[in-house]
Curated annotation (Swiss-Prot):
It comes from Shigella flexneri. InterPro entries: CorA_cytoplasmic_dom, CorA_TM1_TM2, MgTranspt_CorA/ZnTranspt_ZntB, Zn_transp_ZntB. Keywords: Cell inner membrane, Cell membrane, Ion transport, Membrane, Transmembrane, Transmembrane helix, Transport, Zinc. Belongs to the CorA metal ion transporter (MIT) (TC 1.A.35) family. One of its GO terms (molecular function) is zinc ion transmembrane transporter activity. Its main location: membrane. NCBIfam families: PRK09546.1. Residues 1-273, 322-327 are cytoplasmic. CDD domains: ZntB-like_1. PANTHER family: CORA FAMILY METAL ION TRANSPORTER (EUROFUNG) (PTHR46494), ZINC TRANSPORT PROTEIN ZNTB (PTHR46494:SF3). One of its GO terms (cellular component) is plasma membrane. This is Zinc transport protein ZntB. Zinc transporter. Acts as a Zn(2+):proton symporter, which likely mediates zinc ion uptake. The lineage of its organism: Bacteria, Pseudomonadati, Pseudomonadota, Gammaproteobacteria, Enterobacterales.
Amino acid sequence: MEAIKGSDVNVPDAVFAWMLDGRGGVKPLENTDVIDEAHPCWLHLNYVHHDSAQWLATTPLLPNNVRDALAGESTRPRVSRFGEGTLITLRCINGSTDERPDQLVAMRVYMDGRLIVSTRQRKVLALDDVVSDLEEGTGPTDCGGWLVDVCDALTDHSSEFIEQLHDKIIDLEDNLLDQQIPPRGFLALLRKQLIVMRRYMAPQRDVYARLASERLPWMSDDQRRRMQDIADRLGRGLDEIDACIARTGVMADEIAQVMQENLARRTYTMSLMAMVFLPSTFLTGLFGVNLGGIPGGGWQFGFSIFCILLVVLIGGVALWLHRSKWL
């Protein structure tokens, strides 16, 4: 591969433009630098910035299809070969478990043995781990190591997010055992998060597996083995997601059953109350007809005796219901 001049890559509004020093560190890219396989360059761009968008649209260092893909709409994770270069689209978890993950953060990468061009619109928090290692001098030394470290960081964030969702499901199951129903929409959000994760992480696992199997010239055998380990780790996370989705379905049925039982219990209680007071209601209605005069209306103890009879009647009905094991 021919060397690249630093002035051809240095974009004024780039998030950062660094050269890997081959010892785990980086230095800012200068216009006089020479970019080659021994000293690759990492150019990280926000494709909505003016200078970055113009560079992506006009640079001869990228194939036409790659230029469009790096600044295009978000797609599912995939990997494509373009001659000596490779275009990779990845997804990352940025938010917390309380947010709606309708769209995961997308990061697109084009790389060969000399140049790494990554683009994004929203910040990719997982890259902070790789950036921190490079600034401390303990980061990757070449393009293959950079890609493995980035995929490892993305998988770490995904695994942490899946673990948090798993913990929330365990808490929800414990609450259901105590007949505690979650707030409205809580389970729907949880299930939405799991489904979105499953949608994007499954093809991302396939991307990792393909990168591990492809004989890319800038990846060593050790780096391919590490990439396969990352794919396997993400695969285990997907198995956990599938299990969590199944558990949320069971919990939805359990919540519906608990709510139905509560409704049935309240209806049963109201029915028993109506049964207890039904005889007294009949007697008070009968006495209140007053067609031939109220019986005992002229007796001073008539009303008191009638109230006592009602209490005895209600108590008798309640006792009968209790002995019949309805109460």
